[in-house]
Amino acid sequence: MLPLILPIGALLLGVALLLLGGGLLNTLLAIRGGLEGYSDSSMGWIMSGYFVGFFIGTFLALPIIQRIGHIRTFAFCAAIAACSVLLHVLLVNPVGWLLLRVVTGSSLVILYTVIESWLNGYTPSEQRGKVFSIYMVVNLGSLALAQQLLRLDSPSAFTLFALGAIL
């Protein structure tokens, strides 16, 4: 199993960091929205914006990848995602957060597309199931671990948003 993991170790580490940041942001926004006094209905709309963006991003991924390539697409979408996380602290209103969630969802689904296409392209057919099972363990483990990052500071502070953007 180790010979299978070593060549993709850096990519799996990148996935772990990406999902730590995304998982942290998802929970952080729900808590911070409550602290800001947003209604449950507003929070429902805000959080659903991620999935609207996720859907939109599926249509944007291929044209962007074809136009600028996998590496530039990855860098571009990682930068957009990081900026959108940080902007949540500056645009503290439900409409702003909804729009930022759409941007975040689009960016992340394009990042997942690039990552999974790299894994798919690297892996021989007979090993693909093993590689993607490792990928899913990293994926879900990172999302679970991300919740513990909330212990590092108050949700009302900038620190957790900065950490989410860094990851």
Region locations from a protein language model:
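Helix-loop boundary and gating motifs at the non-cytosolic
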Residues: 2-51
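Helix-to-loop junctions at the C-terminal end of transmembrane segments
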Residues: 57-70, 150, 154
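Paired small-residue
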Residues: 95-103
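Structural signature of the two symmetry-related core transmembrane helices
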Residues: 72-87, 165
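Helix-breaking motifs and short loop linkers at transmembrane-helix boundaries and internal kinks
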Residues: 69, 90-95
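Core transmembrane helices of Major Facilitator Superfamily
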Residues: 22, 103-115
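Intracellular juxtamembrane helix-capping segments at the cytosolic ends
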Residues: 29, 110-123
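Residue-level signature of mid-helix packing/kink "hotspots" within the transmembrane helices
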Residues: 51-59, 143-144
